[in-house]
Amino acid sequence: IIFKSISKINKSLKKKIFIIGNFNIIKKQLKELNYKLQLNKINDLSEFSKKIDVLNIKDNRKKNYILQCIDIAHDLAIKKKINGFINCPVDKKIFKGNFKGMTEYISKKNNAEKKEIMMIYNPSLSVVPLTTHIKLNKVTSNISLKKIMIKITSLNKHFKNLFKFKPKIAVLGLNPHNSEYDQNSEEVKYIIPALKKLKNMNINVAGPFSADSFFHKRNLKKYNVVVGMYHDQVLTPFKTIFNYDAINITL
């Protein structure tokens, strides 16, 4: 993924990109995959060259090698030595059951537990699941007015900071046809009251919409972000529409 991505970007952007990892492993993979890129081993960001620089992680035998790479990237970002970092797909076993995935891990490192947002971004539309990588039978108990308020307020703030405009946010209900607004439904107890409060905060939010009929062209042109109640509710239609043309941004 790294070599393929670097091969496709322009020369000016290549100068701003470097890899964090074990130089020998990366060099070996480069050769095996037959990519014609020139690598340069560095031990400090001051050693940048015109080649593809690899910030060398010496001890790749450590069990936490991948986490070490992530932690270094995170530390550089916090110190504002880099603008950001991109991680390749990560085997969740490295978290040893302590975290559901990268979103939660980064949240913990930033003292923002339970406030993390996993936004799957495409320039045409982004989606955000209120709950991330949890079992379906745990979803209902993880929905609350407070969580909806926190997540959408944070989403609105960070989206504006990243893309320099105020997003139009659509929110889906949890149940089929929003449970026809049954008084004991999550829509009536949590989602609708949260949306009323958010509108009073001047956040451009609408819903709840029934998930089964939301994802068609007319609706997609109206909104920048769709917030669903659980992972597959928004990621399944999103990946079908955009054919994996997206990136996962942790907010």
Predicted regions and their residues:
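Anion-binding alpha/beta catalytic cores of soluble intermediary-metabolism enzymes, centered on
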Residues: 1-251
